[in-house]
Amino acid sequence: MTAPTVPADQHGHPLPGPADPAANDTWRPSRYREPLHPDNEEVLEQAAYQAAVTRSSGDDRKRKIKPRRTVDYQGGVQKWRMLNKLKGVHEFRPAIHPNPSDIVNFLPPVALRSNPSTSICDYWVHTSINKERSPTRVVRWTPDARRLLTGNDKGQFTLWNGASFNYESITQVHDDSIRSFTYSHNGQALVSADKGGTIKYFTPHLTNIHGFQGHREACHDVSWSPNDERFVTCGDDGLVKIWSYREAKEERSLSGHGWDVRCVDWHPTKGLIVSGSKDMLVKFWDPRTGKDLSTLHSSKSTINTCRWSPDGHLVATAGQDSVIRLFDIRTFRELEVLKGHEKEVNCIEWHPIHHSLLVSGDALGTINYFSLLSPTPSTPITTLSAAHEDAVFSLSFHPLGHILCSGSKDFTARFWCRARPPGGQEFDKWHLTEEGAAQKELERITKREWGTNAPPANAAGGGGGGGGDKQQVALPGLSNLVAAVNSVKTGPTTTGGGPSGLPGLGAPNVHAGTPPSRVSTPSSMGPPGPGAQGQAQGGQFPRGRSALPSQNDMLRHNHGSRGGFADRDRNGGGDRGGMDRDRDSRGGRQDPRGNQMYGRGPGGPPPGPPPGQGGYNYPPAPPNYPPYPPSSYPPPPNNQPGYPPAPNYAMPPGPGAPPQSYPYNRPPQGPPQNNNPGGQGNYGASASGGYGQYGGGGGGGGGGGYGRDGRR
């Protein structure tokens, strides 16, 4: 069979084209490729954003997207309405946990009328800077509370979003500095005044509908009447003028001030006007007759601002003397003088819900909160010392009362909200377990009370009675927390692992009234005393008196003090600390042989503490270490069970009298051991404890009584 002929050129090279027509039906890949996947939408959006930034800026600089910060602009109204609609839970208030997600459980101030402190807006949220570098003279929330309107020294209105606080629009409305503007009570009109004395009308959409010359000089303040039919203005011409809004005509001019009138305010419900002037006078006017009803002469400087309280009973005035004066119109007397500012006070604002809460701003940039329900209403309850970098000119609360806005000379308007649940480092039991959360709280309180000299809060130490190796976490919130966990293992036979006492209940060497800075730490307490070995078994340090009595102190009238648990002893404070089970004297009971045993219980006192048998005195201080502090407790009454007798006490012998000698034959005594008189088990470093003769009542702080063989 003849092979097919391959077409070739004159040089013998094959011509293009398959020799076999069937070769066109076979596809042979030149290289292997992965199937194409569409790009992620997020990647496409980011690329589109970067392209738009490049086109707008003309360069290739990469800019980061910064999300807007939004607070609880609804003030918890939705949550509150839901709770009100549920039957039986209208008084229910959800708990706020330390988690940012719990912000949904915030309720509006109107739901918390009984607690004004929940409406203090001291948490900074956002700073809005004017587009034009000009001081912000006035800040006011719009009637719908969705936006904030500010006026500056260049005669411009600026709108800011009330939720994200970003800039929305700016409008030139005056030819001079805007000094005041206010919305009517029904929210349908806006009246503004400037430094040139011009008064203008605006719609809620900031459309100028009318303007006229109201004062010959600067107009400083504007206030509406309760029915929105009239408004009142004041100016540097020394006049207070009442205007008809519909006719835009002056109805009455109130003259009586001898200098510039800086502020004016109409009573919220009645026909009464208050004004303050540079002549240091506060005047009350009747708008129907134009007469001066009363004049207050308390101030000794210029009056910068005056405001009626929302209930209309009080009026607050402030000026260059840096104090705020409260007057009660029912008596026309000064009620209180609020101090706390260092410079002149420029603005005052009452809380719209809590009428006892007042906020003020001064020329130093400080914002102070005052509460008339406070035990000391003359001092601020909250101070924002650096709220602004320059003088604060205006303050305005959100109608719900959960956000405060402040305008300043530093060209900014700053927003403040209520304190929110903390985030970032959760200290709850769901993140750190219960012991971890308690440990974190303990470390926080330790650092607060001890500062940089705080010992480690998790230091393990020997405790009375062999408590095992499990770490005991102190209870947070009590006093003397650090002393409860400060522990250092002392002695060669330390076996205990528990804490030395509950916080505030028997902390070592902490006396009543001792400040945290004076509490002895393990590094400053010195080496143990003569009973170091017994001390290490029953507790690592001698327990001094604390701010609260210990459990042993409270129960020692009824029971012998129980030290730790050793091998076989119930009352011994350490290894073989007391008697055996057949000889322990727990609180002065009869022993099996019929003899009366006197422990630290109600069995009655012995005729006196023999040397080395335990007494009520403190042990001698070790050399080169500070002596034990004197006791702050009063001396115990005479003949009280469990306490030592008086120095000259002598009970006549007879039936029922305490024995004058040992009920058993004393064991043979060796050479005298030069032992110091031991202290009581709970108060001394000696190994002897209590008043039991054969192991009675070993102390929790030291070894208990006699050993099992009857010797010390």
From Swiss-Prot:
Main location: nucleus
Comp. bias (Pro residues): 603-612, 619-671
Compartments (UniProt record): Nucleus
Keyword field: Chromosome partition, mRNA processing, Nucleus, Repeat, WD repeat
Region (Disordered): 1-37, 446-473, 489-712
Record GO biological process: chromosome segregation; mRNA 3'-end processing
KW Nucleus (keyword) present: yes
SMART domains the UniProt entry points to: WD40 (SM00320)
WD repeat extents: 131-170, 173-213, 214-253, 256-295, 298-337, 340-380, 387-426
InterPro entries reported for this sequence: Pfs2-like, WD40/YVTN_repeat-like_dom_sf, WD40_repeat_dom_sf, WD40_rpt
Low complexity: bias regions: 533-545
Basic and acidic residues biased stretches: 565-592
Gene Ontology cellular component annotations, sorted alphabetically: mRNA cleavage and polyadenylation specificity factor complex
Ranges of compositional bias, category Gly residues: 460-469, 494-504, 678-712
Annotated function: Required for 3'-end cleavage and polyadenylation of pre-mRNAs. Also involved in chromosome segregation where it has a role in chromosome attachment to the mitotic spindle.
Record protein name field: Polyadenylation factor subunit 2
Protein's organism: Cryptococcus neoformans var. neoformans serotype D (strain JEC21 / ATCC MYA-565) (Filobasidiella neoformans)
Upper lineage: Eukaryota, Fungi, Dikarya, Basidiomycota, Agaricomycotina
